């Protein structure tokens, strides 16, 4: 039994609150336990310069944490004048993950910006961001369909993400902050609803992991992501 009384293979309490803000074409407040992230999707006509004239769209993401998302205040990155390497890494991960949901050739020359703002952090902010932003992206697509009438549906399918870890030879699903800080290995996994992998990010701390342990973590991640995608479908009314 874990510190929050979950089983090793159990997700935290997950929720999605759609249409959380009124201005964005898509907005979702996603909660993975005590981790809460506001994900908004904004649609703009036009694409980056290197895509102009190609008839394709673009999807990109930004990520940030509110100053008091953690137990001590962190200075805003805007006040520091630069983004941290961690922030840049995470927002690239989110963008890559969400582009796997969409056939960009069917999006027209439109750009969708996904903004993921961490309101409260207790581990798994990047995986919560991917999973929540996927729903916001679908709501934004519906907005485009209503106003611009795309010739074909660009949606390929849902994606979701979860963290897994290895501690004392046992695999843990959906790590909170304390678990993430104390695990021998932590791994972030992003997958499609077809069970295909988009991203694997794994690191061992002090104690390397074996191939068998990697397989154990991936099996657990597949289970968790299948459950998350089922929850996404419920939230979307599918």
Swiss-Prot record:
Enzyme Commission numbers on file: 2.7.7.56
GO MF term list: 3'-5'-RNA exonuclease activity; tRNA binding; tRNA nucleotidyltransferase activity
Residues making up the signal peptide according to the UniProt record: none
Any coiled-coil regions, as ranges: none
GO biological process: rRNA catabolic process; rRNA processing; tRNA processing
EC class of the enzyme, as a word: transferase
Reactions mediated catalytically: tRNA(n+1) + phosphate = tRNA(n) + a ribonucleoside 5'-diphosphate
Keywords: Nucleotidyltransferase, RNA-binding, rRNA processing, Transferase, tRNA processing, tRNA-binding
The keyword Transferase belongs to this UniProt entry's keyword annotation: yes
InterPro entries, sorted: ExoRNase_PH_dom1, ExoRNase_PH_dom2, ExoRNase_PH_dom2_sf, PNPase/RNase_PH_dom_sf, Ribosomal_Su5_D2-typ_SF, RNase_PH, RNase_PH_bac-type, RNase_PH_CS
Binding site for phosphate: 86, 124-126
Assembly mode: Homohexameric ring arranged as a trimer of dimers.
Homology family: Belongs to the RNase PH family.
NCBIfam families, alphabetized: RNasePH
Its biological purpose: Phosphorolytic 3'-5' exoribonuclease that plays an important role in tRNA 3'-end maturation. Removes nucleotide residues following the 3'-CCA terminus of tRNAs; can also add nucleotides to the ends of RNA molecules by using nucleoside diphosphates as substrates, but this may not be physiologically important. Probably plays a role in initiation of 16S rRNA degradation (leading to ribosome degradation) during starvation.
Protein name: Ribonuclease PH
Record organism: Psychrobacter arcticus (strain DSM 17307 / VKM B-2377 / 273-4)
